[in-house]
Structures are given as C-alpha cells and as structure tokens.
C-alpha cells in the first residue's frame, strides 16, 4: 500500500499525492491571503498551520474576467473557481529523497489580467518527469487586485512573485530540489515579470537562470500618476467619485468595472491592457529591460515570428481596416514616412490589418527583444530564438502567433484541446519541434546549456555574430539575418 506523501515545510506539513510516478502538491499557500486589510498590500509570509494540510487539490485562481465562450484564439485561459485567496503554488517532483535537483518555476502570462498557474496545460509535470527536476507553477494577483496604484502598496503582483520565490528558496529542498539551481520560465507577462524580478533586491538573489518567452519589453510601465488615473477610471465605472470606495467592493464588481476600463483605454491599433506595472522605487525603479540587460543571470530570450496578430485578428475594427485607415494610424508613429512604413511592414499580398500587427509586434516584442540580446551580448552570454511554426487557425492567417510555442516547450499538446490556435497542427511537426524545444528547456535548466542530441548547435548571440535559433516545421536552424533593418530604419526616421 502506498502511503500519502508528506513534505515538511517552514509553515507546516503538507500531504500530497502520487500521480504517474511523481509526487504532487497543489494549492500550497506561500503567503497570507490578500483579503481584508491585506488587499492591495505587499504579500506577507504565510503564518503557517498545525497538523498536515491537504495539498492534493488546486486552490482558487486569481479573480479575472472570463470571455463568454472563451477567446477565439486561446479558448479558456482562466481556471475557476476564482477568489482573492489565491496566493498558492503547485509542485511536481520525482522524489522526496533530499536530492539536489534543479528547479523550474513557471510564471504564466495573460495581459496582466488573466491566466492561472492551475491550468492543466501549465502543469510542470512534463519537465519534472522528463528532466528529473522539480517543477513549480505559481499564482499571483492580476488586474485590479494586482496592478492598481493609489490604494496601498504598488506592484503587489510583483511582491506576490517575490514571496513565492522566497518560499521556494526556503522549502524546495524538502521536495528534492536545490535552492541554488532555480530557473524561472515565463511567457509574455510572465517573462516581463522575470525581468522585473531581476532588479528586485530580494528576488534577484533567489534565481539563477531564466527563459523569457515573448517578453513585451516595448511596454512602458506607468508612473504612479498615470496608474492612479486608471484607478480613478475604475471607480468611475463602478459609480464612485472617490477611489476609497473600491475598498468595500467585492472582487466580482472590481472585475466587472475592469471591462469598462479596458474598453475606455484601448485605442485603435493598440494592444489592449487595462492596467500596467508601475514605476516605484521599492519594486520597479527602472524599466525591466535595463535590468535584464545588466543582470548576471543566464538567459534565453525569444519571440514568435508574428506576435502582433494576437489582439487584432478577431477585432473587426482593425481586421477590416483599409490601407487609408492604416496609413492614418502610421502617421501618428512615423509622420511623413507613413507610406514608407506601410511598405516596410507589408509583405506580398499582406492585408492592411497585418501591417498594424507587424508594427505592434515589432515594437512590443521583436525590436525590444533583439535589443536585449544585442546589448546584453557585450556583457553577458545570451541565446535568442524565433519560433516560426504557423497556427492553422483561419487558414494560417495569424502566422506564428503569440503563445504558439507553449505546447511545444511544455510537450503537452494533448492538454491544449479546445484551444483554437493549435487545432489541426501537423502531428509530425509537433513531434519534431517538441523534441527540439522541450529538451532544450530541460537542458538549460539543468546545465545552462540548451544543446542536446536533437539540437547539437545553439550558439550564443554576439554583436559581431547575431545568431538566432529559428524553430520551424522542419526543426531548428541558426540564422544571422533577423535584425529586420528595413523596420528599424523606418522606426528611427
């Protein structure tokens, strides 16, 4: 008879379960519930418990909007039930043997508004099983509960992540992990989070490597004043003149009001965001892109080829725009060079809306990511990749869309059922590309070098040799011509 696995942590004992050869602990609280007086306050260590706490089931996900029927691209991205008491993590380990396995910590994205570490497709069991490492996913506050300014502490979402890392460093040895071999892996907002953590005085001591998938480094944090204006907009949408009234609103109403804020502040041709990270001396004193350039952690950074199609493909205001409308939009960025900008971002037969998608993808992801690789290469090693596998959705019109690489890195396409953007992928392509990327991530977490039998060469990016690993249908090859000088020259005119 197999007994229930028990892990001993600084907060108390946890009772997990054994699943498919792994020891699993879900819904583990790493901080005090951020409710009551702790709403909009920095995360605090959990006070602990007596006895054995059940850790066999997920805790609630962070409150967030849920799109009826799901996103036309991602499907469902949240994982109900939702509740403010959401500061938990989930952990998979091959053994509780006191080993010194490397640790992978997954930080999900979702436009700073949606997502969950509880999603089945974000479970890190595939990494734990295939790489003999400890895999962890975390939850943190989102949207109005994580990003408001003027209500207490700033950037409480980031303090959640810091507290999670502190808990992991203090306790992962009890799960067979090595606190001195922690790698953070994040996508989109999760990758941006990693860069912010790299400059945090506590967090930067608690991890050693990072994989940044599609970090939107072109996103500028707001000032406290700009962010407080969004807080006031939320209060207004809920019928209040004073932001203090928000303290008494249930989280369901805060989420409801957030939809109004999002609609009010999303302009034509802009990536929709209701709230932003905030410049704050204690948490984000400078743009995260600067910290990741200067950081001594080992990193991989990458992007998908067509990041910018994600928010616009199913937005009729943009997807049905004609060339005149797009050039009018370009004039606000490039002035008299709008026509040249259009041609630079338009391929043969490109629809007008994809010009906007290319510009936004370039500004938010490609150029900023390339800058990180280029500037960091003069100081520290860095590897870069571009993911080119095209989503079958809408006959391939979205290209290699934002998020498309994740089923391959996680090696769990079967858990993405119902996600429209991956339906219809060629099984041979899936097998081939998964063998490359999933094992590369494992190798990097284990050794700092992502090469392996199926990927014998992945050179570091250097200013005099800008090598980027391009991952496509046939596998991976190294390219050195991805700077897209036509786009850069137009942007700097």
UniProtKB/Swiss-Prot annotation:
Keywords from UniProt, A to Z, are: Herbicide resistance, Hydrolase, Plasmid, Serine esterase
Q: Which residues cross the membrane?
A: none
Q: Which GO biological process entries does UniProt record here?
A: response to herbicide
The record's section on Pfam families has:
COesterase
Please indicate which superkingdom the organism of origin belongs to: Bacteria
Q: Which InterPro entries match?
A: AB_hydrolase_fold, CarbesteraseB, Carboxylesterase_B_AS, Carboxylesterase_B_CS, Type-B_Carboxylest/Lipase
Protein name (record): Phenmedipham hydrolase
**What organism does this protein naturally occur in?**
Pseudarthrobacter oxydans
